[in-house]
Amino acid sequence: MASMCTFSSPFLLCNSSISRTNIVACNKQTSTLQAQVKNVATIETTNRRSANYAPSLWSYDFVQSLSSKYKGDNYMARSRALKGVVRTMILEANGIENPLSLLNLVDDLQRLGISYHFLDEISNVLEKIYLNFYKSPEKWTNMDLNLRSLGFRLLRQHGYHIPQEIFKDFIDVNGNFKGDIISMLNLYEASYHSVEEESILDDAREFTTKYLKETLENIEDQNIALFISHALVFPLHWMVPRVETSWFIEVYPKKVGMNPTVLEFAKLDFNILQAVHQEDMKKASRWWKETCWEKFGFARDRLVENFMWTVAENYLPHFQTGRGVLTKVNAMITTIDDVYDVYGTLPELELFTNIVNSWDINAIDELPDYLKICFLACYNATNELSYNTLTNKGFFVHPYLKKAWQDLCNSYIIEAKWFNDGYTPTFNEFIENAYMSIGIAPIIRHAYLLTLTSVTEEALQHIERAESMIRNACLIVRLTNDMGTSSDELERGDIPKSIQCYMHESGATEMEARAYIKQFIVETWKKLNKERQEIGSEFPQEFVDCVINLPRMGHFMYTDGDKHGKPDMFKPYVFSLFVNPI
């Protein structure tokens, strides 16, 4: 853990209340504790719970062995050449004469994961299409349902307000929508961009879901069937972009109108980025090994899974430093969550929470060794990022980062007390605390800092404008997590989750409670969509994307189980995203 102490030293030198003697003592204490990690379980006499988490499938040696030929100059040169060809393709496309073709191209570029190369070009294209076809109802007259649906989705995604009434011409007297199968698929995808009180889109989602499920049973075109079945599992708006890219590159050759040059560029870009992600993961793995936290037998060793969360948040090549920071934050949250949920006694947890709130390094002698280690890891990582931000961007962010950990631990201790008292909270009482205890808010706050080009007091205060957006993103992750993990967590002795709280309060069956939570997630997405439309332009686009991508990751990780907690479920994605090139 010597490297972790090195992280803290520069910041401590900036703090006049802590002497150099204390810094040296902190360094020595941390190094000593590192040697004691492996003995924590053997010296323990307190009777503690165990979650019996499965061990990690990914050894340090395996991660360090990852390599890729796509770091070579010849691949980079070919990528630059293909990028130029695709850019010309966008610029020469005539969106006025054939808007559907151009919208399909934009959609393909996004799903193939290469749209980040052409942000200005895509922005200009969508602006022209909006002005010529979507700005006012009189421009909709000659547009079919397919064009309206695809344009609606892409334009709403990029911040344009397109009213739901654009679809009313395609509703018959019975309330059914009229269109072919591709139109229905695009309308289905468009409906997930709804906000509150948009009944036309609610009806569209219900109708198209039923229509597509019925069509899937009898459809002869297996290529279209492939796209329908994929959409019914994960609508595009709820899909993790990098996971979607991995899937879409494989099926894009089957799509009508596919472009071989676009496909070649997408494959090459995916493999080049995979090489970048391998190096990021190797660096994170070295840090994880230095902390020795993987030797904590009571906690989940999930470094690779935590790294996946950061790739979901932002996979772009320039965000390497950010992924490094966020992987550390994710990993520490996972371990500290297990401390509060399973391993720690209530007196220990109350003391730990008090020390986090005071942020007093001199008070940690009162803690058991395993909690000293947890506190020092957060303390040092916070100091490191504070120091780097102060030296690189000229602003002291330590209070901002410290508060993120304090808010998290204060939510954890509430749940620990609920468990200790055998208390089942009401549904509303649960979610008012659980949106924080899911651990997403600290990630978002760190991500905000990492995406700011200029860090100022005004910028840090401005995030308060996004509090509702952040809360709803956290809440979706919380509820998707509950849908996928609550049964396992109850078996190991955790507190009741949202499903059980709703059942206890309302008398509902588990099936009824799950249906309620599922609809609650849909309604929360509507709020998130609206907040993104209203205030998204006030923040860096990469930050807004991160906020939206985290609930997408919640759906991905916890649909049909717990990919974060059960390594076997996540294994195929490690190989497809980080090991095997396309």
UniProtKB/Swiss-Prot annotation:
Gene3D superfamilies: Farnesyl Diphosphate Synthase (1.10.600.10), Terpene synthase, N-terminal domain (1.50.10.130). GO terms for cellular component: chloroplast. The keyword Transit peptide applies. Pathway: Secondary metabolite biosynthesis; terpenoid biosynthesis. Mg(2+) 3 binds at N481, T485, E489. Mg(2+) 1 binds at D337, D341. (2E)-geranyl diphosphate binds at R300, D337, D341, R478, N481. It is an enzyme of class 4 (lyase). Binds 3 Mg(2+) or Mn(2+) ions per subunit. It catalyses: (2E)-geranyl diphosphate = (1S,5S)-beta-pinene + diphosphate. It comes from the Eukaryota. Residues 1-87 form a transit peptide. It is found in: Plastid, Chloroplast. Mg(2+) 2 binds at D337, D341. Keywords: Chloroplast, Lyase, Magnesium, Metal-binding, Plastid, Transit peptide. One of its GO terms (biological process) is diterpenoid biosynthetic process. Monoterpene synthase converting geranyl diphosphate to (-)-beta-pinene and (-)-alpha-pinene in a 94:6 ratio. The Asp-Asp-Xaa-Xaa-Asp/Glu (DDXXD/E) motif is important for the catalytic activity, presumably through binding to Mg(2+). This is (-)-beta-pinene synthase, chloroplastic. It comes from Artemisia annua (Sweet wormwood).
